Amino acid sequence: MKILFINLPFSGHIIPTLGLVQELVKRNMKVTYLLTSDWKEKISYTGAEFSEYQDNKKLSVQMKNAYYAAVKLVSDYDLVIYEQFFFLGKHVAEKFNKPAVRIFTSLASNELIMQEFINADGMFGIFRSKWICRQWTKEVAKGIDLKTDCWLKEILYNPPELNLVYTVRNFQPFADDFAEENYKFLGASIYQRALNKSFIMPPKKCPLIYISLGTIVNNTISFYRKCIRAFEHENVQVIMSIGSVVNKDRLGKIPDNFSVYSFVPQLEMLENTDVFITHGGMNSITESLYYGVPMIVIPFITDQPLNAKRIEELQLGKKLMFRKITSEMIRATTLSVMKNPAIHEQVLEMKKEMRSKNANVFGANVIAEYMSKYC
């Protein structure tokens, strides 16, 4: 079987899919992953073939570049797999009468969930205006026969037959809206990744707090300083990942119980972590739950506020609002979560569910079963 995989160049939308690609390649399927050039090394590591479309700072141009590159390739493939926000993926497949599978690296979307994404800060905010959404869609999808007049509606109202979601059904809000025969919930995407030989895990001496705000919103020096003040006199060990933008020297004196890095291999960290302070991206949440780690979620954009809300609803941790946060709030909330038996009990239950399926093996099985109708 030959599979064309199409995605947009955003880390959180790509990283979970690479485990599925590895599994498909392991089964002797030929996978070509269509992405921008800066992802070539990571794609090649999976064993898939890499195919490039031109990157651009404008999302609209990225979409068009990906679409036209895919159209040139797709006739040679048996199946198209695409991530939900590349909304033209189904149209690429239909143009050449190919089956399509859609992947959700965030929560599966219905009207209420999509509205939450739009109302949050981030790149979707501009689409609160229905006129802007229609005009943007018209420009991106010129000459393509859409089912709706807005790309976000296209995600909602023009789904493919099969959808794979990287969380568990019990974490998904409005789960009953997503029919079991069409939406398969995989759990967390945990797979073999390239080793980072430059990182040496410090010996664990006491309860460990891991702090990371992901790859997009990490230029927040004031927040990192508040974390230092929160825990500098506590009997805890803190590992803080600050990204490549912030200069460590600007944080001032680093206490002895802190280790600060520009990058930390997250899965290795979570295996040893007692509480995770996170921005609440879907990957970070599913990975944390896979390792049974409760969270303090400080949401910023798009799906993160809804993810944080869900963490509190399910008693898997606590939410703090970035604009109101103080050192005392960080300290008190983190220590409270660390000692809360009800939260730990719920996290362990969710850990069992996240591990109940090997997400990428299950996903590959579902794809193989689906494609048996076409082969």
Q: For each of these PLM feature ranges, what is it?
A:
Residues 1-129, 137-138, 222, 232-375:
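Glycosyltransferase specificity loop/lid
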Residues 20-22, 97, 179-182, 201, ...:
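Short, solvent-exposed amphipathic alpha-helical segments in soluble enzyme
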Residues 164, 209-210, 227, 238, ...:
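Conserved hydrophobic/aromatic pocket- or pore-lining residues that grip, position, or stack substrates
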Residues 216-229:
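A conserved mid-protein helix/loop that constitutes part of the nucleotide-sugar donor-binding site
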